[in-house]
Amino acid sequence: MKKQIVIIGGGFGGLRAARALKAASVDVTLIDRRNYHLFQPLLYQVATGSLSAGDVAAPLRSVLSRQKNARVLLGDVVDVDPASRRVVLADGARFRYDALIVAAGSQSSYYGHDDWRQWAPSLKSVEEATTIRHKILYAFEVAERLSDPIQRRAWLTFAIVGAGATGVELAGSSPPAAV
């Protein structure tokens, strides 16, 4: 019987691990809560309207379609039981593993200030990028109808917190009047 490899997460790490096992005599099960791989480095372009969500999301099954020893399951892993070597999904399904790779990604931290989220959205998902895009477009729509230059400037002023790659790319792709 082939060894069962379970990979939690279909991001860069999870896909890299799955592909590295292509020639191995194992069965690979990749589990993710989304059925697509998100190319996160381009999310800023979704937020600014340069790309659509479909341009940065590739179906996981398509990405691994030529890999005969891999399957993709949609599910939310809620528990790992090392004693029985099983992962448990939110729907109660259990999957046995001989080896487990956890590549679940990351999320933004508001350091105990979750109320900041409404004013400082993170940019880690298609949904967040789309929300930012809608907020930017709404601000431009409101500003276009204003005759008072001070009010108009207030609606067209955005603050980008973070000087990592995402923050720099977002700032660099925003209209000059908006930054």
Predicted segment positions?
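Beta1-alpha1 glycine-rich phosphate/pyrophosphate-binding loop at the start
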Residues: 1-73, 78, 158-159, 165-179
